[in-house]
């Protein structure tokens, strides 16, 4: 790590802390040459592999925008969406891989969204699972009711 003051590449870590719900590490460093102190933030990069094979950086904001469309007209707060996005990100990061399929993110969204708002869940699931008819909605509703019944 280069010192921002004298550009020496030797520094020592004085303090390290986990930040951003475990996705980043903040390090306080001291330059070996000039004794200047500076802070670095190291972030674990998570890439999303899309259906077409291209990879792009994971974006919590993009996830929120997608779920927000499903929640349109529903009584779902921005804070609830942020919490859901954080939960989904933690779920996909917990697999320990630096790459995740877009499909896996969609799967990780379904359960917390169902707990948040069932109508938004159905809207999201209809796009994610490519519903083609009312029968698809009916079978998904039956699955939801069965899961609710089995959870008691």
Curated annotation (Swiss-Prot):
Top-level taxonomic group: Bacteria
Cofactor: Zn(2+)
A single MF term (Gene Ontology): zinc ion binding
Keywords tagged on the record: ATP-binding, DNA-binding, Metal-binding, Nucleotide-binding, Repressor, Transcription, Transcription regulation, Zinc, Zinc-finger
Any Pfam family matching the protein: ATP-cone
HAMAP family in the cross-refs: NrdR
Protein name: Transcriptional repressor NrdR
Origin organism lineage: Bacteria, Bacillati, Actinomycetota, Actinomycetes, Mycobacteriales
The encoding gene: nrdR
